[in-house]
Amino acid sequence: MLKRCGRRLLLALAGALLACLLVLTADPPPPPLPAERGRRALRSLAGPAGAAPAPGLGAAAAAPGALVRDVHSLSEYFSLLTRARRDAGPPPGAAPRPADGHPRPLAEPLAPRDVFIAVKTTKKFHRARLDLLLETWISRHKEMTFIFTDGEDEALARHTGNVVITNCSAAHSRQALSCKMAVEYDRFIESGRKWFCHVDDDNYVNLRALLRLLASYPHTRDVYVGKPSLDRPIQAMERVSENKVRPVHFWFATGGAGFCISRGLALKMSPWASGGHFMNTAERIRLPDDCTIGYIVEALLGVPLIRSGLFHSHLENLQQVPTSELHEQVTLSYGMFENKRNAVHVKGPFSVEADPSRFRSIHCHLYPDTPWCPRTAIF
C-alpha cells in the first residue's frame, strides 16, 4: 500500500517537473503593440466588459462610475488616461491629427527657398496694391515671391528681380486669368521647388504660418490646401466633345484667399496644366483659373481639397478674425463686404485713414522689429 502510494507520488512529481520545464523553454508571447496597450488601458478605465461609454465621450470614456472603478484618485485617472491615449495614438507612420481635424503627415524640414509664392497682379495695381505688399510681407522673403503681371514696370523690376511678364491680357476675364495661372504653373515646375502657392495682390501672407502649415505635409504627396468660398461643390458643364456636355461637381479653393499645391500633385496635373493645356482645360468648363485648378485636382485626379480656415479672402467678414490669433493665419485680405469696408480689426500705430487695408498694422504686430514700425506701438 505504501509502496503504491510512493510510486504515484513520484509519478506526479515527475509530471509536474516536466510541465514546468516545458513552460520555461517555450517561446514567450510577443509583447502587445503600443496601440494595443493603449486600448487595453482604456478598456481597464472603462470598467468591466460591456460597460457603455457616455454619449459624446467616445470609446475612450465610460460612465463615471465605471471610470473610477479601478483608480483611487482623479490625478491617477487623468495620468492613466493621458498615458493610454498616448499609447493608443496613431499607428507607426500614420499622420497626427491637428486641432482642425485634418489628418496631416509627419512634418518635414522646410526652408523659404522650398516655396514658390506666385502673386497675380495687373499693371494698373502696381502702385495701389503691389507697393504695399513689397513694403510689408514680401520684404521679409523676396526669394520666395514671384510677381506675375501683364505690363513692364522698371521701378518694380528694380525693387525685386522676380517679376514675370505673362504676355496675357490686362482684362479681368476668365481667359486672361487662366492665361496668368498657366504661366504661374509652368514657372513653378521649372523652379524645382517643393510647394506652389498662389495669392492675389490684395492678400497679406504670414510667411511663418505658411511654412508651418506646409511643413505639416510631405511635398511628395497629393496636397491641395485652401479655403472654398462656396458652401457646396460648384457645378459646371464639362464639354466632352463638340456637341456633348455633362455636369460635373467639385470643390475648389478660392484664389482670393490663396491656396497651395504640393509638387507631387502639381506633376500629376501636367497633362491638363502644362504648356497650353491649362487654357484648353479651362475652356472645357468655361470657368476662371481657380475653378479650373479645382476641376483638375478634384474632378480629374480625384484628390480632395483640404479645407483650411487659416486662409482668408475679402469675400468673408474679416473683422471676425481675432487679433489674438493673427499669428496663426496664413493669408489675410481687405476690400468690401456687404457694401462696407472689410478689413481685419486690429489696433496699431496707424489710423484707419493712414492704413485702410490694416496690412501695415498687421505687419508691425507680426514683425515689431521692422524699421518703420513705431517702437511704442500698442496692439
From Swiss-Prot:
Chain segments carrying region Disordered: 86-107
Transmembrane segments annotated in the record for this chain: 9-29
PTM: A soluble form may be derived from the membrane form by proteolytic processing.
Function: Glycosyltransferase that initiates the elongation of O-linked fucose residues attached to EGF-like repeats in the extracellular domain of Notch molecules. Modulates NOTCH1 activity by modifying O-fucose residues at specific EGF-like domains resulting in inhibition of NOTCH1 activation by JAG1 and enhancement of NOTCH1 activation by DLL1 via an increase in its binding to DLL1. Decreases the binding of JAG1 to NOTCH2 but not that of DLL1. Essential mediator of somite segmentation and patterning.
UniProt similarity note: Belongs to the glycosyltransferase 31 family.
GO cellular component: extracellular region; extracellular vesicle; Golgi membrane
One GO-annotated biological process of the protein: regulation of somitogenesis
Pfam family, one: Fringe
Residues modified by glycosylation: 167
Cofactor mode of binding and number, as noted: Manganese is the most effective. Can also use cobalt with lower efficiency. Has some activity with magnesium and calcium, but not zinc.
E.C. number: 2.4.1.222
Involvement in disorder: Spondylocostal dysostosis 3, autosomal recessive: A condition of variable severity associated with vertebral and rib segmentation defects. The main skeletal malformations include fusion of vertebrae, hemivertebrae, fusion of certain ribs, and other rib malformations. Deformity of the chest and spine (severe scoliosis, kyphoscoliosis and lordosis) is a natural consequence of the malformation and leads to a dwarf-like appearance.
Record note on what altering residue 188 to L does: In SCDO3; likely pathogenic; loss-of-function variant; the mutant mouse protein is enzymatically inactive and unable to modulate Notch signaling in a cell-based assay
Amino acids binding Mn(2+): 202, 314
Organism: Homo sapiens
Protein name: Beta-1,3-N-acetylglucosaminyltransferase lunatic fringe
Gene designation per UniProt: LFNG
Residues flagged as site, Cleavage: 86-87
Disulphide bridges, residue numbers: 168-179, 197-260, 364-373
Chain positions recorded as substrate binding sites: 129, 201
Main location: Golgi
Keyword Manganese among UniProt keywords: yes
Membrane topology, from the record: Single-pass type II membrane protein
Residue intervals annotated with topology Lumenal: 30-379
Cofactor annotation: Mn(2+); Co(2+)
